[in-house]
Amino acid sequence: MSRGERGLSASVEAAIILPVLVLFLGLLISSARISIAQQHVDSAAASGARAASLERGSRAAESAARDAVEAALVASDTGCSTLQVGVEAAALEAPLASAGSVRVEITCEASLSDVALPLIPGGVTLNSARSSPVDPLRGR
């Protein structure tokens, strides 16, 4: 039995398969974009925690962490429509020779509007939290 006798032509097969392949490719691209954006947010949180751990007080640590997070996200071209940065810097107020760490938490609303396909949301919320140790013997 030849292909013509089965009743399906190449154009009909392509018309059925092509939309599925395009949708799969779109999902693959959006998944990759989300994964890369999450890596950038993780890196920004680590940069913020490191910058905060080098400061002498809680207020300076919060400011340094926010500046470092924003700079890292701008450098990686990760656009956050909404950015929240939380800093836990109580370890900076601990007495000399006390071990501790500074923790930075980030919540970023990233846009996926340039990958506009059905079933793909227009944005995604990315969360990350990182810690950095405070040097227990540094001057306070």
Question: What would you call each of these model-derived segments?
Answer:
Residues 1-69:
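Alpha-helical assembly-interface signal, strongest on the long, hydrophobic N-terminal helix that forms
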Residues 54, 58-140:
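Short, conserved structural patches
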